Amino acid sequence: MKPSVILYKALPDDLLQRLQEHFTVHQVANLSPQTVEQNAAIFAEAEGLLGSNENVDAALLEKMPKLRATSTISVGYDNFDVDALTARKILLMHTPTVLTETVADTLMALVLSTARRVVEVAERVKAGEWTASIGPDWYGTDVHHKTLGIVGMGRIGMALAQRAQFGFNMPILYNARRHHKEAEERFNARYCDLDTLLQESDFVCLILPLTDETHHLFGAEQFAKMKSSAIFINAGRGPVVDENALIAALQKGEIHAAGLDVFEQEPLSVDSPLLSMANVVAVPHIGSATHETRYGMAACAVDNLIDALQGKVEKNCVNPHVAD
């Protein structure tokens, strides 16, 4: 008899078929308490869980006594109670490598669109404001040869550094938990403390996961240390930034502009002051949102669940020690 798994995110037909070759698959719309209650017997028997954008906490795990592995279609897993999973010896799988290049593309797009005011001036053209030769009020700022500060030199940080160094001749500063020898050798990146990075960078790109240590890592103190001409980019996790402090820094002119793919609350409220600022490019968490990459992430998550329930945790496992 095939193991039972719960799928709470739609999959392409071929990937659903692959999953069904290994498991009895039960599809649900979400992991809300109402859904769990209505499908209590299914949740009680499930050995696997696959999906994204839902919280997996201790309360849910209490309803799933046979759960052995959960697979998220994402690289981030801050919506999972890792301690609760680990305490119950439940494997947590994620998709860390598939989206690297695509998210780096998004970061570079935010750098370019904020610096060159692409969104703002495009809207002005559509509004009929381009009636003569443009003047300084249409101008942006250069990207090439400007200093890029990267906070978080992981896979995505490395991919961004490659684009910035080889594509735009940008000097690279970085701050991370440890020195990154490859970044220093390939991109001539210079490790520095966070204060130095903030003071010297023309663009500050934040690429950090959300943890207890990184929550509100960027606040009023950090923005005050940046150049008034600096542009802030965040495509990591929204709550790493104190959004009210960011809004205040933009309103006071402490920083020049911001390109944001993530926010403290998502979707972003239509009443957010960020949406009324011409110097803010706000996009709806599109970091990995291409057809190719989202398919690749889903395929990776399917394979991860198959591997996990077969005891294979050599890659893409957040807590592999629980399999010991």
From Swiss-Prot:
InterPro entries from the UniProt entry: D-isomer_2-hydroxyacid_DH (IPR050223), D-isomer_2_OHA_DH_cat_dom (IPR006139), D-isomer_DH_CS (IPR029753), D-isomer_DH_NAD-bd (IPR006140), Glyo/OHPyrv_Rdtase_B (IPR023756), NAD(P)-bd_dom_sf (IPR036291)
Keyword terms of this UniProt record: Cytoplasm, NAD, NADP, Oxidoreductase
Gene Ontology CC annotations of this record: cytosol; plasma membrane
Top-level taxon of the source organism: Bacteria
Pfam families: 2-Hacid_dh (PF00389), 2-Hacid_dh_C (PF02826)
EC number(s) per entry: 1.1.1.79, 1.1.1.81
GO molecular function: glyoxylate reductase (NADPH) activity; hydroxypyruvate reductase (NADH) activity; hydroxypyruvate reductase (NADPH) activity; NAD binding
Catalytic residues (UniProt): 237, 266, 285 (proton donor)
Catalytic activity: glycolate + NADP(+) = glyoxylate + NADPH + H(+); (R)-glycerate + NAD(+) = 3-hydroxypyruvate + NADH + H(+); (R)-glycerate + NADP(+) = 3-hydroxypyruvate + NADPH + H(+)
Main subcellular localisation: cytoplasm
Protein localization: Cytoplasm
Entry function: Catalyzes the NADPH-dependent reduction of glyoxylate and hydroxypyruvate into glycolate and glycerate, respectively.
Quaternary structure and partners: Homodimer.
Entries under PANTHER family matching the protein: 2-HYDROXYACID DEHYDROGENASE-RELATED, GLYOXYLATE_HYDROXYPYRUVATE REDUCTASE B
Family recorded in the similarity comment: Belongs to the D-isomer specific 2-hydroxyacid dehydrogenase family. GhrB subfamily.
Protein name: Glyoxylate/hydroxypyruvate reductase B
Organism: Escherichia coli (strain SMS-3-5 / SECEC)
